[in-house]
Design a protein with these regions (language model features):
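Nucleic-acid endo/exonuclease domains
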Residues: 1-157
Length: 157
């Protein structure tokens, strides 16, 4: 059993036992699971690079490393899943102030653009996948249909 099959097996066992992990049940995790399958490689999730950093702060003068949703080192691809808070204001996500002195929504836009600008400079292809590429509920959550969704992901990758 390879690593991909093993992780899938553990996910199935956890599901059968009723063990839930909020992050692993998210649309982001679902879409990256589909990407893993299409690309035939398990992503490094929430991976960070030394060269991709947030704004400096007192506690971190060089800026905190910015995570990417999924990195496929053998293909040199980063996949970023774009939930609704990446395209519209969401009070829950935007209420916090940031070290940069801008609202969280504005900081998210800045950091998204930073990923777009910097990753290609290091030869890394950035693929952004939006929730709107899939069928979704009014709350912008994906209506999961694995067969249909895998075709969507294949078309985007």
């Amino acid at each position: 059993m390879d690593q991909f099959d093993l992780e899938k097996h553990y996910a199935e066992v956890n599901a059968a036992l009723g063990i839930k992990n909020k992050r692993s049940d998210s649309d982001e995790s679902y879409v990256i699971d589909l990407c893993d399958e299409v690309l035939g490689e398990l992503a490094l999730r929430q991976h960070t690079f030394d060269f991709l950093r947030g704004d400096p702060s007192e506690s971190c003068p060089s800026g905190k490393k910015l995570p990417v949703d999924a990195y496929y080192p053998n293909k040199n691809i980063v996949v970023e899943y774009r939930e609704k808070q990446h395209t519209e204001s969401v009070a829950f996500f935007d209420r916090r102030s940031t070290v940069s002195g801008v609202g969280r929504g504005e900081q998210r836009r800045i950091y998204d653009q930073r990923r777009r600008d910097i990753l290609p400079q290091y030869g890394i292809k950035l693929i952004e996948i939006s929730y709107s590429s899939f069928n979704y509920y009014s709350k912008k959550k994906i209506i999961r249909n694995r067969q249909r969704d895998i075709l969507v992901v294949k078309g985007l990758l």
